[in-house]
Amino acid sequence: MSKQLAAQVPAEPVVLGKMGSSYGIRGWLRVFSSTEDAESIFDYQPWFIQKAGQWQQVQLESWKHHNQDLIIKLKGVDDRDAANLLTNCEIVVDSSQLPALEEGDYYWKDLMGCQVVTAEGYDLGKVIDMMETGSNDVLVIKANLKDAFGIKERLVPFLYGQVIKKVDLATRTIEVDWDPGF
């Protein structure tokens, strides 16, 4: 890895998508975007991938729609064999590229690992995942081992103001109005 590339390695990596199977014989790949608008993944450059524990920068040469898929052509990936080597690689950028959000909006990555407590002080557990349901996002919370209700996992809707009362990213705490029995 060159020194120039080492300086550009993402300080705070965030996954924006994943490369899928190869398409055709000229090095095109399917891409699965995790951005809210699938095409937004192309707004964030440069892309990085990790291969054998080493960061590598990849350059997007072109992209287009093919049926329901998005397909990409990366610079230097010119045949099916080269494309196959990138299948399942996550597409990573530095989080500093992401736009600032308004009050009450959060990136999922920022909520991961936050401790969730009720307004009464009951510790519900830690956020381990998020789900998109269509109507609202849902926190997936891993309950503490000695949970008084014997619950291992909780699903709490991320409804700011209704269920979510306060998010404090500095202390990594989310306060909720939620019955611990659920």
Curated annotation (Swiss-Prot):
One of its GO terms (molecular function) is ribosome binding. Transmembrane segments: none annotated. It is found in: Cytoplasm. Its main location: cytoplasm. Binds ribosomal protein uS19. Belongs to the RimM family. An accessory protein needed during the final step in the assembly of 30S ribosomal subunit, possibly for assembly of the head region. Essential for efficient processing of 16S rRNA. May be needed both before and after RbfA during the maturation of 16S rRNA. It has affinity for free ribosomal 30S subunits but not for 70S ribosomes. This is Ribosome maturation factor RimM. The gene is rimM.
